């Protein structure tokens, strides 16, 4: 696959012979936020953490951050290898989309604090949105 997007920074740790785990950070974060988790896992797994486009050490990107581009970046990081994808927050959405679009590359998915707004049980509004609505529009 040819990747024509921005340069994506990634770092790998652990024995290359071990199963691969890729850590995908959330919005308003970067791969450094996954460093402690990476260090806990890299004794038993090959761990990749990367900065999503526009974050950390990856090429600055003005947006929009569409899901197809985020998944293409993850596929670039995988480089044809099959992995368990661990996603935090928006990174969980990237992990789920990658699993749906590239099941041959995804051995499993673990997500936490991931917004699932398309699910019928997801709250229609957040406390912040409700507070803004209650306060009215600024003049």
Predicted segments, located by residue:
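Conserved HGGG/HGGXW glycine-rich cap/lid loop of the alpha/beta-hydrolase fold
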Residues: 2-60, 67
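Gly/Ala-rich beta-loop-alpha elbow adjacent to hydrolase catalytic centers
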Residues: 87, 91, 95
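Flexible "cap/lid" loop of the alpha/beta hydrolase fold
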Residues: 96-138
């Amino acid at each position: 696959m040819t990747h024509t997007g921005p340069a994506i920074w990634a770092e790998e740790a652990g024995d290359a012979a071990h199963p691969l785990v890729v850590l995908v950070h959330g919005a308003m974060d970067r791969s450094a936020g996954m460093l402690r988790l990476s260090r806990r896992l890299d004794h038993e797994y090959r761990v990749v953490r990367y900065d999503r486009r526009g974050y950390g050490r990856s090429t600055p990107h003005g947006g929009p951050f569409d899901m197809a581009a985020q998944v293409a970046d993850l596929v670039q990081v995988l480089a044809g290898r099959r992995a368990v994808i661990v996603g935090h927050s928006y990174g969980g959405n990237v992990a789920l989309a990658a699993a749906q679009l590239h099941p041959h590359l995804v051995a499993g998915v673990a997500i936490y604090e991931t917004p699932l707004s398309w699910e019928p049980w997801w709250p229609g509004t957040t406390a912040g949105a409700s507070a803004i609505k209650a306060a009215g529009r600024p003049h």
